[in-house]
């Protein structure tokens, strides 16, 4: 049997911009507890994003995240001995965390020297609705669209 659901932890906003989403992004990028290094990388990438977009860095960052957020995704559902990929709507908090994860992993998988340039390029691509993280979102949407016939298994 399931126990009670875990309580949501309140996340401290980041020190410079006072933004909770940016704090989540920094925490996702952090390796081995090196938060100050992750903050330096993210803040430098945001400066480059602001230069490229000629916009407030936080607004540009939020727009980049919104462009990567998925609306629907598929989940495996076993019905009568066969497994179907059933499309489900994605809750807001899961959509945000998926978008952050996709941006960070696609920036990490880029070939290049420093993480600042890779991350800033990925954020610029996400802002302009291009790049691997947006492609990942479109692939997820395409899978959900292809399996729309199984949407009635969504009980």
Curated annotation (Swiss-Prot):
Domain of life according to the entry: Bacteria
Record-linked Gene3D superfamilies: Ribosomal protein S7 domain (1.10.455.10)
Entry keyword set: Ribonucleoprotein, Ribosomal protein, RNA-binding, rRNA-binding, tRNA-binding
GO terms of molecular function: rRNA binding; structural constituent of ribosome; tRNA binding
One Gene Ontology cellular component: small ribosomal subunit
SUPFAM superfamilies: Ribosomal protein S7
Subunit structure: Part of the 30S ribosomal subunit. Contacts proteins S9 and S11.
Family listed: Belongs to the universal ribosomal protein uS7 family.
Function: One of the primary rRNA binding proteins, it binds directly to 16S rRNA where it nucleates assembly of the head domain of the 30S subunit. Is located at the subunit interface close to the decoding center, probably blocks exit of the E-site tRNA.
Protein name: Small ribosomal subunit protein uS7
Gene symbol of the encoding locus: rpsG
